């Protein structure tokens, strides 16, 4: 698969040691393993080959993959989330912990916590002390991927629309090209999206890196609002 290709991937991720399903994009697999979540949408993951969004072992395997072919392979911790690092397990006072959480009632062993801008997991809480593990939850874990590249996005407009969706989670933009320049008409409601300012700059960088576009124009259209006539 060529570097820079934008692809849709169905995948299942397992813990090699326990055999437990960690993640999946497929509803039937989630139900089979009794981890189905009604609140989420199961659909293929979208990624750009070689842009570093995924763990190293998966990126390397994707570079040699073909579409519509199912692969199953294992990744050692060094090519995934690294080995566990004992120096990332720290003991702090309970007072420091309590000052760092918004709702102490939600604390429990295994609960995620943020201390001084660092994300970790509460391992122990007793005698006025708390032990926090700042390792990635999958550090030291060998992983098994089963995946299929189900689609390669073709065409400039389609690739732009897909990058927009990747960066914003939305698909209600309008895309127009004039030579190498692109104009993107924004949906009205994006004005209320607090993440748009950051996503916009990330998107421009992605467009220039993966599509080599020229000028990028973000177009806002504000139409007059007409008051509804009163019912007689």
Model regions: which residues?
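FKBP-type peptidyl-prolyl cis-trans isomerases
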Residues: 1-232
